[in-house]
């Protein structure tokens, strides 16, 4: 479809935005996200025969690339041939994706399982003969977004994904959506080792690699190579943002780590869902952006809980290895070096780091597993405009799985929007908080205090993996916050 044809469709698309949000046509016509979602989508992107015993699997040479650049897909299958289809994930009228390439025919090759490093437990693949994929076609470079390459073994029909992000390093989109790939990798137990004991064979690893396929997410749900993107929170938020016509560009937290100039190119930064693992550089860059007036929206919980370091892989490729000693931080090589002890891979709020995440976010992690309701506290706040909610009103089922609360390190002037009680199976109980504050720069910082908030935005995965929890009120609140950020009205 030509750009002219797409522009002709815009009035209908604008009128059909699901949350009642109006986009000025003169603005919409230059909104690449809206134009992209006017293109024909497909529902053929989902797996019809997911791999069950590693019949086919793969990983990408980078977590993200700039649009038009190349990326290598490393694939292992014992079958003689496989195909690759590539999809950009979005709304597309509810179809959920657009096919941008494929099917591409490839010869199969069984790749070796690496041995774990005897000291750190690192599992790093060094596979051969990748498929080189250029993120461009006859229409030009692909638009920024989250992409899934679907691998299909020809003989058996077994399938798996490889996930990667396409950036747009030249465009100043209103919103920057960060995919939290370091958290995907921390929980990934492919080969038998993750940063966690619960899904590791023996002790948890002290280092994990992006140079391997994704095996499972934190909750044991098979992800078929897509990391934590599809089955938990990020895809729900992405679908809603693109459905509602927001101007969005995409990056990963590795990009946030690398580039101090990334966030200031955008009006607001979105941390979505489960964003648990942060480097010192990530924290510096996000706080510096806030202090320059970039708004922050934390649509999740448990963000910036553990500090990690990024190191090269065995080939020298930068930022492919995540170091995280966590509860074993005393064994971290930096622990004995006073000059570098602040970078020890432990909790941000404790020890030599002593940089509580609540000072940035407004709240910080307090409990899991939680499955409860969000309870309104200050219903007079502008964030609740148009919701019809009063104090004590509830947003059913949107509090969980991990939740955050106000802490002593929270900034002064913090507005408590919701104060939600919860009870754990252990008998413990407490409260989680939704908050908003305004930094001295004028930047607004919003935190939902709940991972489940994204299920209020979009019902993908319901009822297959969870109950339906889409909430008109949650969508209106999110609109109110994002629109206030983008309009520059300010005021917490």
Residue ranges and their predicted role:
Residues 5-22:
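N-terminal export signals
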Residues 25-55:
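N-terminal pre-domain segments of enzymes
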Residues 55, 59-79:
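Contiguous beta-strand segments within globular domains
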Residues 80-82, 86-90, 97-105, 156-262:
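Aromatic-Pro/Gly-enriched surface loop or interdomain linker
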Residues 82, 123-171:
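Extended acidic/polar, glycine-enriched regions
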Residues 89-92, 97-132, 150-153, 176-177, ...:
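Catalytic cores of eukaryotic secretory-pathway lumenal/extracellular enzymes that build
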Residues 112-143, 226-312, 472, 491:
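Helical hinge/lid and interdomain linker segments adjacent to catalytic or ligand-binding clefts
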Residues 320-455, 459, 474:
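Glycine-rich, aromatic-lined ligand/substrate-binding cores of catalytic
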């Amino acid at each position: 479809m030509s750009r002219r044809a797409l522009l002709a469709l815009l009035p209908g698309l604008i009128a059909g935005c699901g949350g009642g949000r109006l986009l000025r046509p003169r603005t919409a016509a230059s909104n690449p996200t809206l134009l992209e979602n006017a293109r024909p989508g497909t529902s053929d992107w989902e797996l019809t025969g997911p791999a069950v015993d590693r019949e086919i699997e793969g990983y990408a040479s980078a977590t993200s690339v700039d649009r038009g650049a190349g990326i290598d897909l490393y694939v292992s299958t014992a079958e003689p041939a496989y195909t690759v289809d590539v999809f950009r994930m979005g709304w597309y009228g509810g179809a959920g994706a657009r096919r941008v390439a494929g099917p591409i025919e490839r010869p199969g090759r069984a790749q070796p399982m690496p041995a774990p490093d005897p000291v750190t437990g690192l599992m790093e693949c060094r596979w051969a003969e990748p498929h080189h994929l250029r993120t461009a076609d006859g229409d030009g470079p692909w638009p920024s977004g989250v992409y899934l390459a679907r691998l299909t073994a020809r003989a058996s029909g077994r399938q798996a994904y490889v996930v990667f992000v396409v950036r747009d390093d030249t465009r100043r989109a209103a919103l920057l959506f960060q995919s939290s790939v370091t958290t995907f990798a921390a929980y990934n137990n492919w080969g038998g080792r993750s940063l966690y004991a619960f899904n590791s064979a023996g002790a948890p690893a002290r280092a994990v690699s992006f140079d391997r396929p994704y095996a499972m997410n934190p909750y044991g749900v098979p992800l078929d190579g897509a990391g934590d993107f599809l089955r938990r929170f990020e895809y729900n938020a992405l679908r809603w943002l693109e459905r509602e016509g927001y101007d969005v560009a995409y990056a990963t937290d590795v990009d946030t780590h690398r580039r101090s100039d990334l966030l200031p190119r955008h009006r607001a930064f979105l941390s979505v869902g489960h964003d648990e693992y942060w480097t010192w550089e990530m924290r510096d860059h996000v706080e510096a952006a806030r202090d320059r007036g970039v708004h922050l929206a934390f649509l999740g919980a448990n963000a910036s809980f553990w500090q990690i370091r990024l190191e090269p892989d065995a080939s020298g490729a930068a930022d492919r290895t995540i170091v995280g000693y966590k509860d074993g931080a005393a064994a971290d090589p930096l622990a004995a070096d006073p000059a570098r002890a602040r970078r020890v891979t432990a909790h941000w709020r404790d020890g030599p780091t002593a940089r509580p995440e609540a000072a940035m976010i407004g709240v910080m992690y307090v409990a899991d597993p939680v499955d409860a309701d969000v309870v309104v506290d200050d219903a007079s706040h502008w964030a609740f405009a148009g919701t019809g909610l009063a104090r004590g009103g509830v947003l059913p089922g949107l509090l969980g799985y991990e939740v955050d609360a106000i802490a002593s390190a929270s900034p002064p002037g913090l507005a408590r929007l919701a104060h939600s009680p919860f009870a754990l199976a252990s008998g413990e109980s407490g409260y989680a908080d939704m908050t908003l504050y305004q930094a001295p720069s004028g930047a607004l910082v919003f935190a939902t205090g709940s991972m489940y908030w994204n299920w209020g935005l979009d019902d993908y995965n319901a009822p297959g993996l969870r109950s339906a929890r889409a909430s008109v009120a949650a969508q209106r609140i999110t609109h109110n916050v994002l629109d206030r950020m983008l309009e520059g009205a300010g005021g917490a």
